Amino acid sequence: MSVIQDDYVKQAEVIRGLPKKKNGFELTTTQLRVLLSLTAQLFDEAQQSANPTLPRQLKEKVQYLRVRFVYQSGREDAVKTFVRNAKLLEALEGIGDSRDGLLRFCRYMEALAAYKKYLDPKDK
């Protein structure tokens, strides 16, 4: 079973449970945008392919994306909490060689960013 559900937009409401400071979420928009920009490149590549199975090069990029998420998590506790609560490492691992899985992951990341923007008073 995939970590990211069919209703990934509803699942993205996990943002509501992130730790907050006095003026908004501990996770900054910049920190989230770093993770989102890493996924955007993969989204573009996956969309160009009609094959339901990811090519080796793209699977390697998904694995490298996991490394980058781990690295960013190690740099900032707010990112680590976000990655854990949103189950992003598990979701990346669950992609395997599925093109649809990668596209769903990328859309989930976009949904997370959208909810952060919507809910964070600093972004208004």
Swiss-Prot record:
Q: Name one GO biological process term.
A: defense response to virus
- One Pfam match, given by its short name, reads Csm2_III-A
The knockout note for this entry states: Deletion of the entire CRISPR-Cas locus (cas6 to cas2, Rv2824c to Rv2816c) decreases resistance to plasmids encoding spacer elements about 6-fold.
Anything else the record notes?
A: Encoded in a type III-A CRISPR locus.
Assembly and partners are described as: Part of the Csm effector complex that includes Cas10, Csm2, Csm3, Csm4 and Csm5.
**What is the purpose of this protein?**
CRISPR (clustered regularly interspaced short palindromic repeat) is an adaptive immune system that provides protection against mobile genetic elements (viruses, transposable elements and conjugative plasmids). CRISPR clusters contain spacers, sequences complementary to antecedent mobile elements, and target invading nucleic acids. CRISPR clusters are transcribed and processed into CRISPR RNA (crRNA).
Name of the protein in its database record: CRISPR system Cms protein Csm2
- Species this chain originates from: Mycobacterium tuberculosis (strain ATCC 25618 / H37Rv)
- Write the gene name: csm2
